[in-house]
Amino acid sequence: MNSLVLYGAGGHAKVIYDIILSNDMLLEYLVDDNPPADFFHHLEIYKPTEELLRKHKVIVVVGDAKAREKIVNKLSRICAFETLIHRSAFVSRFSELGEGTVVMPQVCVNAEVKIGNHCIINTASVIEHDCVIEDFVHISPTVTLAGNITIKKRAQIGIGARIIPGVTIGEDAIVGAGAVIVKDVPAGATVVGNPGKIINLSELGEQ
């Protein structure tokens, strides 16, 4: 039986713990830098130590992409990371998934998809052929990505968004819930609506 350490004691950890149980795996430790007084099902939370982390594969279960990246960079010299796929998900044998990435229930990942490290591919999302998803991306529940889409680092695709073939979503961009994206989204932009319109451009996107 595979045993894991989860790093982060927030809402995302609850979902990942459930997947671990569904996959007949073992949660060895739940660790957090600032453990809450009480947590889901009274799970005991430990302070992370180098000795503990070296002994097990780790999944960083922090929803915010920049925070997740910061923790991963800190841990990368210490420990190995686990990739987790819920047993109800379909992941093509011709696709690639990076380390630390989590694939939730009822997800479909089709042929020649490349998913980077430490991504969240959330419940019932569909990723069609030849998409490229870079590191630390969050694909929210029920998102549909048509073929040949590129999602750059740390981008977040909101619940139920739809993106047409061949589009590129820039680094740190946010696609709002329910948006329909029919053209490229620049880095740092926030896009909402049908068709998607830019409502904000971060400092990264303005540079």
Regions found by a protein language model. Give the residues of each.
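Short, basic/aromatic-enriched C-terminal tail that caps enzymatic domains
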Residues: 39-43, 191-207
